[in-house]
């Protein structure tokens, strides 16, 4: 069984828009991030991104996880550590 899932983007049929309210913003962000991280999309875009953009995106994601996840959450939810 796969450890990772992107089911939200498959099931979501709500509004995809930003700035209309917290719930719509959260749903839109989840939708966009799951679409962005799709294997086919990533294979296409990562080769076109500058070294600076790769580093900027990597650092942004790391900073957000460090800010909003505990160490245990990072290991359990993001890394999917079993132990």
Model regions and ranges:
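N-terminal acidic leader/helix
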Residues: 2-40
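Charge-rich, solvent-exposed alpha-helical interaction surfaces
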Residues: 11, 28-32, 44, 60, ...
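A general structural signal for well-ordered secondary-structure junctions
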Residues: 39-42, 75
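Acidic, low-complexity, intrinsically disordered interaction modules
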Residues: 42-58
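Short, compact, well-ordered microdomains
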Residues: 54-83
């Amino acid at each position: 069984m796969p450890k990772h899932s992107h089911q939200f983007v498959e099931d979501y049929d709500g509004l995809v828009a930003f700035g209309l309210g917290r719930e719509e913003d959260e749903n839109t962000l989840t939708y966009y991030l799951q679409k962005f991280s799709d294997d086919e999309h990533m294979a296409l875009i990562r080769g076109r991104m500058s070294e600076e953009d790769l580093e900027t995106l990597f650092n942004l994601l790391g900073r957000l996880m460090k800010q909003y996840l505990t160490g245990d959450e990072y290991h359990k939810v993001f890394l999917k550590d079993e132990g």
